[in-house]
Amino acid sequence: MLMITSFANPRVAQAFVDYMATQGVILTIQQHNQSDIWLADESQAERVRVELARFIENPGDPRYLAASWQSGQTNSGLRYRRFPFLATLRERAGPVTWIVMLACVVVYIAMSLIGDQTVMVWLAWPFDPVLKFEVWRYFTHIFMHFSLMHILFNLLWWWYLGGAVEKRLGSGKLIVITVISALLSGYVQQKFSGPWFGGLSGVVYALMGYVWLRGERDPQSGIYLQRGLIIFALLWIVAGWFDWFGMSMANGAHIAGLIVGLAMAFVDTLNARKRT
């Protein structure tokens, strides 16, 4: 037998098992600290992993609930945790995803308590030639956010996309995407607006581009982004460029981040195709 994955929430595990049963694949759940899912027929492992990636992207899809009704397992008799929402948050995010989220929250609280300018003096892109060797500044601008809506919007996308990349491709891949996109999107943005900017959106756009193109060119990677969402991302760039909503947006960072993500996905999928 082969262990496929583990879920903190047994209801989520049961939903996936029920769905796979409707697809002719028999999985079993073993309860330990988490709900471990096991596959007896290892020849079906790749198919199960592809379906698992789709399930993790949208576990609330009606087809999964319908599968539970079909199998008669909507009430499995398991004792579920009281906070399935928190369990879902944990299941979709790895350590790097959480560390970046925590850093953004801590910096946002600091900016609220001691003021934006005080924090920016320490974390902003080098605003004086004497600061160019303070290397952290080329990356720490991603942790600064200037409103509650700003940080919530960015962290939601970071959790959704960054968590998927980390879970499927590993923490190393997420770190590489984050570091490169933070550096290059920050460089472009400071050319547009000067050094006084901040936010995770350049990295988020890199993840959008990466996840979408990687999913299109390499479906076996287990990550994908619906085309409707990438269209939304492009429309948001256009809206920011023409200032449709009267909001200050880091247009340079958005465009640069998206290009970086697309380029990295293209290179990764090109290498993957050469290996096959």
UniProtKB/Swiss-Prot annotation:
The chain crosses the membrane at residues 94-114, 142-162, 169-189, 192-212, 229-249, 250-270. Its EC number is 3.4.21.105. GO terms for cellular component: plasma membrane. Its main location: membrane. SUPFAM superfamilies: Rhomboid-like. It is an enzyme of class 3 (hydrolase). The keyword Protease applies. One of its GO terms (molecular function) is serine-type endopeptidase activity. It is a multi-pass membrane protein. GO terms for biological process: proteolysis. Pfam families: Rhomboid (PF01694), Rhomboid_N (PF12122). The keyword Cell inner membrane applies. The active site is at 201 (nucleophile), 254. It is found in: Cell inner membrane. Keywords: Cell inner membrane, Cell membrane, Hydrolase, Membrane, Protease, Serine protease, Transmembrane, Transmembrane helix. It catalyses: Cleaves type-1 transmembrane domains using a catalytic dyad composed of serine and histidine that are contributed by different transmembrane domains. It comes from the Bacteria. Disulfide bonds: none annotated. Belongs to the peptidase S54 family. Rhomboid-type serine protease that catalyzes intramembrane proteolysis. PANTHER family: RHOMBOID PROTEASE GLPG, RHOMBOID-RELATED PROTEIN. This is Rhomboid protease GlpG. The gene is glpG.
